[in-house]
Amino acid sequence: MEKPSSPLRVPVFYDFSSTICYLTHRVLGRLGPELAALGIALDWHPIDLAAITAWRRGEPVGPDRARNLERLAQELGIAVATPAHWMDSRPAMAVAALLDEAPDDEERWREAVWSWVYQDARDLEEPGALEEIARRAALRVAPPSAGALEEIERRTAAAHAAGVRGVPTFLLDAWPVGIGIQEDETMLDFLRRFAARKRGDPGPN
């Protein structure tokens, strides 16, 4: 199949505090070559899930939920260290938002944050976390200002107004779709069908 000349951009809303978002990030990462062949580019948008749901910063992740997340990760073949509590991810997400105009830097930052939390079992709230993450990502970033944190609030409010009620959520033709985490082939089929509809491809009979 010939790769489309113009990429189809798909917004994905996420929160670094969400283990489900981490698993989705890893599944979509494995699908990178297939998505590129389909001409699909993912745009990752950080939002503060605690501002629009019942989750509260500092709230413990109970043992039953932790076991369920770890079982899901095993089914997907992804190693994960589930955080013990819902951490304050706003500063890390504010840095991601500040890097919007430098996509390669934003991608490196996002990957470094995911790895810090879900591979190294580190807390985003521990002293010096952002500085060490930046060092690992080979980036120079300043601590987020009050304005940068307010930008996350603004983006979260805008996403909520657009119908986003959780993460991860894909925005397809202005319609928010929260499909949760799926196996690779299911996720790929979901995005393949959307791309076909968007481009007017009737697909196989």
Protein language model features and the residues they cover:
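Structural alpha/beta surface segment adjacent to cysteine/selenocysteine redox centers
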Residues: 16, 20-117, 202
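C-terminal cap of thioredoxin/glutaredoxin-like
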Residues: 3, 8-14, 20-38, 108, ...
